[in-house]
Amino acid sequence: MHLSQLIACALLLALLSLRPSEAKPGTPPKVPRTPPGEELAEPQAAGGNQKKGDKTPGGGGANLKGDRSRLLRDLRVDTKSRAAWARLLHEHPNARKYKGGNKKGLSKGCFGLKLDRIGSMSGLGC
């Protein structure tokens, strides 16, 4: 197993073990996300009938701002974690350049050991 894959698995296990401890004890379960157009249309339709001075619970702009900021915050965290995992799981684009297996002049012996010049020319390497 490659070292990068081993590190990625270890990090995944570490993140999964930390995940339940980060959960807040009083948070309600997340609701399924709706498309952005419908999300904006529903609060405007519900809040359009209320007057400016109305102090009813659950209505008004404060709740709308809170919902929007929560959605944006969740989206931002999700994007950051996806980018981090993508960097961990994908090798460097020029990784082939750093691997020594495809360079000229690197002859491999019988057991993967590099043969010296004399052994490779005389055939006594194996």
From Swiss-Prot:
GO molecular function per UniProt: hormone activity; hormone receptor binding; signaling receptor binding
Region described as Disordered: spans on this chain: 19-71
Signal peptide span: 1-23
Propeptide: 24-73
GO (cellular component) term, any one: protein-containing complex
Source organism, top-level taxon: Eukaryota
Sorted UniProt keywords: Cleavage on pair of basic residues, Disulfide bond, Hormone, Osteogenesis, Secreted, Signal, Vasoactive
Organs and tissues of expression: Expressed exclusively in brain.
Family named by the database record: Belongs to the natriuretic peptide family.
Identification of the protein by name: C-type natriuretic peptide
Species this protein is from: Rattus norvegicus (Rat)
